[in-house]
Every structure is written in C-alpha cells, then in structure tokens.
Amino acid sequence: MNGELVLRLDGARPLSPASVEELSALCDRAEDDREAGPVTVHVTGVPSAGWTAGLTVGLVSKWERVVRRFERLGRLTIAVASGECAGTALDLLLAADLRIVTPGTRLRLAPVGGSTWPGMSVYRLTQQAGAAGIRRAVLLGTPIEVDRALALNLVDEVSDDPAKTLAGLAEAAAALDGAETAIRRQLIFEDGSTTFEDALGAHLAAADRALRREATS
C-alpha cells in the first residue's frame, strides 16, 4: 500500500483552512500518483463545544467541495474509523467507497446551535441509509451505534484488526484500474435516482469502453 496516499484526520479538531489544505493535498497526490492502490483515511473524534467559533460559510463550502473531490477520485477510497466519529471525521467516512470500523465505533452529527450540524453528512446519511433510518441521528443527535451502522449499510465491516482488513482490501484494489473504478462509482451514484431508460445510455457507454479495453489488452 502506498504510504503517501494515507491521511489521519482528527475529527476533534475544528474545521479550519488547514483541514481543507490537508485533504486537498491528499487528493493532489492521489491524482498525480501512477501506482495502483487505494487512498486511505483514518478518522476519529468529535468536535468540542464551541467548535464553530470563527467558522464561516465560505470555509464550509471549501471543505464540502474538497470532500466531494475525495469522493470522486479516480481510485478506490477506504476509510478506517474508530471511537466517536463526528464533524470532519464523519464527512470523510461517508464519502469513502469502503468503510472499516473498530468495535464500539459510533457515528454522530456534531452539535451546534441547540441541534445538529446541517452539513452534507446529512445528505449522505439520507442518500445511503434512507430518511427513516437516520431521523433520530439528525433530529435528536442520537449516536448511530456500530450494529445499526452495519444494518443501515453505512459501514462495510467491523474489524478487531483493521490493519489486516485494510491490507486485504489494498491488495484487491491494486488489481483495479482507477479510471474504471471511478466510472463504476459514478454509475452507482446516478442509478439511485435515474430511470432505467435514462441509465441505459451510460451503462452501454461503460460497457463499450470495457469491451474496447479488453480487446486491446
């Protein structure tokens, strides 16, 4: 696994320009690196009280855009989460292709203004788990325990040895073509809100691309 394509993010740190720069730099390295393999983020932590002091909508917008960039990278992305995860830690977990968590991990929305933070993690939670599954987390701030996160398909695996699990996924990812992975991911994104007729063209284009690549390999 390429050690250059790893980021450790502490969700207890308030969102800052440095947060944006760190994730942007990871995306830069991922786009420049020609070696096969995944991009990995290790996330944990919950912002402390008062974490929004000095925070602006402009900075939030920059953060959401770089998370979206991470979400659309041309290679497999893996998140490894532990402990309590909220704020920027939850944002990256929900944007990753594959999610490994340790036992006891809990997902939650950061508290703010007498409620929960209304960032794009709410959007991803709703898209991935459905409104009924995440209402209590969004409206009441109820933590999503690991068993429920599994049942809602918000995480893929609970592991006592995440390093071993990650190594297995990295080996599988090394055999993948990054551009093709990005195409499959985009199909998944679009298929959740597209009719069969509208989706057919994109799938046929992807199939044609795959056949052409296979014919020249």
Swiss-Prot record:
Chain's role: Involved in the biosynthesis of the nonproteinogenic amino acid monomer (S)-3,5-dihydroxyphenylglycine (Dpg) responsible of the production of vancomycin and teicoplanin antibiotics. Catalyzes the syn-addition of a water molecule across the double bond of a trans-2-enoyl-CoA thioester, resulting in the formation of a beta-hydroxyacyl-CoA thioester. Physiologically, DpgB could act as a dehydratase, facilitating the aromatization of the DPA-S-DgpA or DPA-S-CoA intermediate.
InterPro entries: ClpP/crotonase-like_dom_sf (IPR029045), Enoyl-CoA_hydratase-like (IPR053545)
Superkingdom of the source species: Bacteria
Key words, A-Z: Antibiotic biosynthesis, Lyase
PANTHER family, A to Z: EG:BACN32G11.4 PROTEIN, ENOYL-COA HYDRATASE
Reactions catalysed: a (3S)-3-hydroxyacyl-CoA = a (2E)-enoyl-CoA + H2O; a 4-saturated-(3S)-3-hydroxyacyl-CoA = a (3E)-enoyl-CoA + H2O
Family matches, as NCBIfam families: EnCoAhydt_DpgB (NF042431)
Family statement: Belongs to the enoyl-CoA hydratase/isomerase family.
Pathway this chain belongs to: Antibiotic biosynthesis; vancomycin biosynthesis
One Gene Ontology term from the biological process aspect of the record: vancomycin biosynthetic process
GO molecular function, one term: enoyl-CoA hydratase activity
Source organism per UniProt: Amycolatopsis orientalis
Enzyme Commission number(s) from the entry: 4.2.1.17
UniProt key word Lyase: yes
Name recorded for this polypeptide: Enoyl-CoA-hydratase
Gene from which this protein is expressed: dpgB
